[in-house]
């Protein structure tokens, strides 16, 4: 039986009115499995704050599992900040952070299964002055990556409407005043073209609009756009809509490719000049969906300075074909396919710093129309961990050896959290020569002894992935009294996320690393942990597996009862404070440092 879902526009904190309507509809046409809200979820003003807080604080009950994306409005920062720090909300969660019983915040962007339906979402708005309510470029990039995964998307949730959605639609059906492109979001247009959902649900416009189905480029199924009004709006516009779609995963190709009556062409690529001029002030709005940045001077061919087609670089194809005004650069596409940072490819630089998880050097000899540079020069300039890089944060370094150096990470989990980093640009610490491995072993033993002198044990972990261009072995001290809990807590966390850790016990840490070197498959990836008692936990990543990059840190944050520090971005401090921590650790480590 197909799941039954209720969709709602901006609640604006009017939860009494919303849930009263939900219960009424449920009696006549229910039951329903879930309620999904798009648009502003929190109140516009303090006047109905008490009503809203009754639900959040448990004095009133949310009657149905409810998911929301509009994380802005009065008290949103306070409530969502508290929600983020809850222990049960730590870790890699795309299916919603629990605010209270039956109420879930869809943070950032993600994709999850809801009663068999594949649901993708982009939370927040394009711009906001607050921490909450604004989506980031990382959220957009993550959603693009998820869109490339196999399997279709049934529901795509955004707060704002996609720019151009009314193009090619029946004029008589378009609500008055909503064709103004300033009230819609071109980034959402780009994303919906890549996600290709069967249903796209959005709020924020204050009106109800069910557009005719439209055809998708490079896909056989159609997309239906549904815009929903605000709860309690004065014009009696529809704010609650029931839907019972059959999950894509259970549909036959014939069912998926069925074309309902009044199906239109794809709305985001109008080429007809007359129609275009009636619906938009100029052609630049449409073009803006295909490129993001001017190509830097060193990337330009001739004097034209063509812009790269963002759609082609991301997916390898462009619906415009020869009609596209932007550059279809096959080399740029190849670099994207190999995991190179899009900003580096298109802008010529990445400004995200250590937050960026993509590669920061090109993966073959091609220069993508750049001036040729040596491989080492390329690496040292773009890599955040190469000592010769201008981006390296030298004030964090606490020891330098022949083949490795030790440094504090940005936003350390605890004060003595250390990274062991190879000086040579290596993708992981499992591809070392015997001499280099020997120095790594000496550093590990030195850190073990240093921590032991303080009543702690050392936990080492590393994520070996194609997206990690320069290796860093993380080392975190844990109280010796809690070390015995490590195997179980790691295994339980892995099971919760849907994978298993292989457990092997060794009498000598050297034997453990030899085992890991044999297990490592360069074509795949590996996550491993070296525990104080000689136990090695490991998980080989399957092809296309999305592994939580912060898994090791999140597990240890839970063990140490500091879940609010699971995200390193919550732990940022000033450069002066970082330098002091580094100096303090140097003094502690001095007698144990193998390179002193």
Swiss-Prot record:
SUPFAM superfamilies: CCCH zinc finger, HIT-like. It comes from the Eukaryota. InterPro entries: Cwf19-like (IPR040194), Cwf19-like_C_dom-1 (IPR006768), Cwf19-like_C_dom-2 (IPR006767), HIT-like_sf (IPR036265), Znf_CCCH (IPR000571), Znf_CCCH_sf (IPR036855). Transmembrane segments: none annotated. The keyword Zinc-finger applies. Pfam families: CwfJ_C_1, CwfJ_C_2. One of its GO terms (molecular function) is DNA binding. A zinc finger (C3H1-type) spans 303-331, 335-363. Residues 243-263, 272-291 are annotated as: Disordered. PANTHER family: CWF19, CELL CYCLE CONTROL PROTEIN (PTHR12072), CWF19-LIKE PROTEIN 1 (PTHR12072:SF4). This is Zinc finger CCCH domain-containing protein 64. It comes from Arabidopsis thaliana.
């Amino acid at each position: 039986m197909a799941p039954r879902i209720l969709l709602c526009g901006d609640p604006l904190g009017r939860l009494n009115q919303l849930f009263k309507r939900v219960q009424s509809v449920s009696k006549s046409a229910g039951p329903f499995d879930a309620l999904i809200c798009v648009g502003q979820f929190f109140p516009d003003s303090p006047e109905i704050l008490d009503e809203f807080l009754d639900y959040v604080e448990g004095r009133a009950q949310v009657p149905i599992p409810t998911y929301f994306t509009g994380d802005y409005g009065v008290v949103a920062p306070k409530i969502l900040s508290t929600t983020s720090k809850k222990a049960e909300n730590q870790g890699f969660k795309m299916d919603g952070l629990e605010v209270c019983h039956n109420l879930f915040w869809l943070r950032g962007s993600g994709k999850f299964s809801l009663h068999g339906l594949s649901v993708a979402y982009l939370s927040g708005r394009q711009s906001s002055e607050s921490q909450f309510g604004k989506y980031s470029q990382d959220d957009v990039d993550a959603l693009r990556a998820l869109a490339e995964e196999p399997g279709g998307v049934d529901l795509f949730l955004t707060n704002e409407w996609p720019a151009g959605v009314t193009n090619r639609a029946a004029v008589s059906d378009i609500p008055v005043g909503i064709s103004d492109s300033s009230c819609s979001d071109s980034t959402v247009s780009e994303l919906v073209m890549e996600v290709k959902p069967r249903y796209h649900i959005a709020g924020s416009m204050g009106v109800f609009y069910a557009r005719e189905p439209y055809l998708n480029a490079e896909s056989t199924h159609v997309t239906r756009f549904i815009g929903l009004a605000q709860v309690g709006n004065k014009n009696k516009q529809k704010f609650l809509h029931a839907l019972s779609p059959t999950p894509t995963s259970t549909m036959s190709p014939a069912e998926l490719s069925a074309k309902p009556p009044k199906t239109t062409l794809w709305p985001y690529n109008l080429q007809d000049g007359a129609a275009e001029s009636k619906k938009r002030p100029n052609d630049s709005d449409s073009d803006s969906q295909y490129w993001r940045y001017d190509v830097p001077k060193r990337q330009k061919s001739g004097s034209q300075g063509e812009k790269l087609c963002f759609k082609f670089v991301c997916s390898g194809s462009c619906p415009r074909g020869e009609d596209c005004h932007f550059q279809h650069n096959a080399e740029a596409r190849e670099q994207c396919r190999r995991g190179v940072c899009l900003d580096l490819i298109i802008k010529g630089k990445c400004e995200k710093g250590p937050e960026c998880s993509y590669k920061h050097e090109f993966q073959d000899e091609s220069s993508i129309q750049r001036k040729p540079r040596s491989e080492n020069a390329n690496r040292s300039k773009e890599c955040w961990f190469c000592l010769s890089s201008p981006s390296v944060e030298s004030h964090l370094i606490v020891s330098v050896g022949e083949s490795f150096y030790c440094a504090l990470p940005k936003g350390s989990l605890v004060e003595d959290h250390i990274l062991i980093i190879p000086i040579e640009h290596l993708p992981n610490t499992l591809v070392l020569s015997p001499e280099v491995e020997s120095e790594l072993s000496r550093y590990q033993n030195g850190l073990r002894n240093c921590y032991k002198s303080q009543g702690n044990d050392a936990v080492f972990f590393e994520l070996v992935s194609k997206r990690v261009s320069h290796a860093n072995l993380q080392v975190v001290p844990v109280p010796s009294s809690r070390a015995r809990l490590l195997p179980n807590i790691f295994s339980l966390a892995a099971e919760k996320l849907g994978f298993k850790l292989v457990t092997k016990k060794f009498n000598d840490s050297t034997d453990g690393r030899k085992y890991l070197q044999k297990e490592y498959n360069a074509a795949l990836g590996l996550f491993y942990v070296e525990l104080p008692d000689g136990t090695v936990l490991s998980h080989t990543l399957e092809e296309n597996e999305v592994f939580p990059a912060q898994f090791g840190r999140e597990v240890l944050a839970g063990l140490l009862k500091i879940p609010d520090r699971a995200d390193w971005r919550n732990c940022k401090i000033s450069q002066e404070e970082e330098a002091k921590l580094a100096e303090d650790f140097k003094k502690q480590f001095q007698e144990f440092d193998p390179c002193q």
